[in-house]
UniProtKB/Swiss-Prot annotation:
Residues the entry annotates as binding Zn(2+): 109, 113, 119
Stretches the record annotates as Disordered: 142-192
GO biological process terms on file: rRNA processing
Gene3D superfamilies the UniProt entry points to: Metalloproteases ('zincins'), catalytic domain
Protein name per the record: Endoribonuclease YbeY
Family indicated by similarity: Belongs to the endoribonuclease YbeY family.
Function: Single strand-specific metallo-endoribonuclease involved in late-stage 70S ribosome quality control and in maturation of the 3' terminus of the 16S rRNA.
Keyword field: Cytoplasm, Endonuclease, Hydrolase, Metal-binding, Nuclease, Ribosome biogenesis, rRNA processing, Zinc
EC number: 3.1.-.-
UniProt xrefs under Pfam families: YbeY
Gene symbol of the encoding locus: ybeY
Residue spans of biased composition, Low complexity class: 159-180
Native source organism of the sequence: Anaeromyxobacter sp. (strain Fw109-5)
GO MF entries: metalloendopeptidase activity; RNA endonuclease activity; zinc ion binding
Lineage: Bacteria, Pseudomonadati, Myxococcota, Myxococcia, Myxococcales
C-alpha cells in the first residue's frame, strides 16, 4: 500500500501524519491493501478553483476525488483525494467537532468515491453512507465523536456523510496520480 500525501496549505503538515495513518487503516478495512492513492491538502481558494474546473461549481467544497481506473477501484492505482483544510476547520467549529474527526470523514468519503461509490441516487447515497459508517465504527470514530461532541455528534458521524453529485473529466486536479503522472480518467471530480 502506498499513500502519498502533499500539502499546499500551511497547516497541512500537522494533518499529514494522521491522514496517512487513517488512509492506510481505511484501505486495509476495505480490503485494498494493494492500493496506491495520493492525498492533496489545500485551502478553500484552491479547492474552489478545482471544483469550478472539474464540476462546474463555483464554490469551495470539502473533498474532491479523482479516480484513475475504469471502472473506479478496479486497479491498484486508485487516484487522488483533495481535501480543503479551511473547510474542515470551519465545519469542525460549526459542529463542535475536532478538526481531525472532520478530516477523517472527508478522507473516508473521498476514498469511497475512488472505489466507485457515489450518491447520485438515493439508494446509492444510502449504500455509501452505510459504508462510511462502517469505516467510522471500525476505526473508532464514533467513540471519538462521543468524546468530542456528545451523542448527537456520534449519531451524525454514523449517518450524515452524503452530499452532492459526481461529474466527469479527463485528468486530475494536480496533474498527478499516486505515481506522479497525469491522470486519465473519465470520472474525475467526484465530490460532496
Amino acid at each position: 500500500m502506498t499513500v502519498r500525501l502533499s500539502s499546499e496549505h500551511p497547516r497541512g503538515r500537522s494533518a499529514a501524519r494522521r491522514l496517512r495513518t487513517r488512509a492506510a487503516a481505511y484501505l486495509a478495512a476495505l480490503g485494498r491493501a494493494d492500493a496506491e492513492i495520493s492525498i492533496l491538502l489545500v485551502g478553500d481558494r484552491r479547492i474552489r478553483a478545482l471544483n469550478r474546473e472539474w464540476r462546474g461549481k463555483d464554490a469551495a467544497t470539502d473533498v474532491l476525488s479523482f479516480p484513475l481506473s475504469e471502472p473506479p477501484g478496479s486497479g491498484p492505482l486508485l487516484g487522488d483525494v483533495v481535501i480543503s483544510l479551511d473547510t474542515a476547520a470551519r465545519r469542525a467549529r460549526q459542529e463542535r467537532r475536532a478538526v481531525g474527526a472532520e478530516l477523517d470523514r472527508y478522507l473516508a468519503h473521498g476514498l469511497l468515491h475512488l472505489l466507485g461509490y457515489d450518491h447520485e441516487r438515493p439508494a446509492d447515497a444510502r449504500r455509501m453512507a452505510r459504508k462510511e459508517a462502517e469505516l467510522a465504527r471500525a476505526e473508532g470514530l464514533v467513540g471519538a465523536a462521543l468524546r468530542e461532541g456528545g451523542p448527537a455528534r456520534a449519531a451524525e458521524t454514523e449517518t450524515s456523510w452524503t452530499r452532492s453529485p459526481t461529474s466527469t473529466s479527463t485528468r486530475s486536479p494536480s496533474g498527478s496520480t499516486a505515481r506522479g503522472t497525469r491522470a486519465r480518467s473519465s470520472r474525475a471530480g467526484s465530490g460532496r
